[in-house]
């Protein structure tokens, strides 16, 4: 038998000694670590529930003495109702073991990896959680000091779905991979996900889909930052648009975004004041051809000639918690021609709309459409609570399918709980009607109307009522005609 060299014998002896020492030390060290982890766990879970309104539960905790803790089958419930809002198959927290011996274990966190999760939040039912989180992440909130204590931490999200609901709206994100890195100098993130947005009140649009790639940086205090978002390509039930790239900046409680400069035929921009809740957005364009930029599905083919439609102008939308929604538009459009029906074509059409509105009314300062065989203009106001118009619409020249031209001046004015519409003369080719008057009384249950008009043969009168459809009944129209010669 060969004799081991003295160096080799020394190495083997040293290894045996180290193993014996490890066996002697590991058990009490492991117990100490688990005891410290249990204490940190109790403190942290209590703080999480206090500051976020969320309660964490899990099936098992598996510590690795020198590296990490693995939590399996983690359930997250909101503390008031006890409803489950999230579940994760596994959460791994990597740490520096020496931090457990100190007074601030937060500084020892090195990584947080989340696997196979599903988050489902209702903004109304879980509004107390939303309020707590908003306060927590405010610039004066507790998270500011929390991130100030962090040195470096790497957060990764794997195969996690997030659903946020509010009334009839639902947003869903499916995140195969996400990364968030925090350091003393700032934070960065990179995220790739599939996004879906549904509003059941606008079912004709169908769900909106997009693939989202986002990346950016923030200060650890969350008071400023910037990001780039790429939506590729957004689509609905009957349309799709090319890839959109948005640039976002956050500073002084203002979240601002705009489309990448010089890439798109229009400019989209907006901002959101996270402190007051006020937000606004605008779209500006010059000779923008929407039906060449966006693609419509085969089942939604536009009228012939509309593909050449070009649009210039701007549209602005704003919201404040007190004033609610408001909007304004100054838009001009042109198309060489448009075929609305076989044999019915409008040529060289130029249309203009100047209007603004809020939840109470729509004010149209100018609306007009002119072409080689078309001339219509008007201005009016519409009260939205009862749909009562006031204003004037002048039809100088409007071609009809029969080939004849229509002309008239229509005036609207409020009257009581309804309105009156008067037309001194309606001319259709050689035929005409004079002294046309329509009075409408708007009632929650029904709408009553009376129409009178005259021509060379006599005076026409019509009285009737319209009952709108509601639960358990169909729409109903009753009317009576009379002719006085």
Swiss-Prot record:
<feature type="transmembrane region" description="Helical">
    <location>
        <begin position="12"/>
        <end position="34"/>
    </location>
</feature>
<keyword id="KW-0812">Transmembrane</keyword>
<dbReference type="GO" id="GO:0016020">
    <property type="term" value="C:membrane"/>
</dbReference>
<keyword id="KW-1133">Transmembrane helix</keyword>
<keyword id="KW-0472">Membrane</keyword>
<protein>
    <recommendedName>
        <fullName>Uncharacterized protein TP_0324</fullName>
    </recommendedName>
</protein>
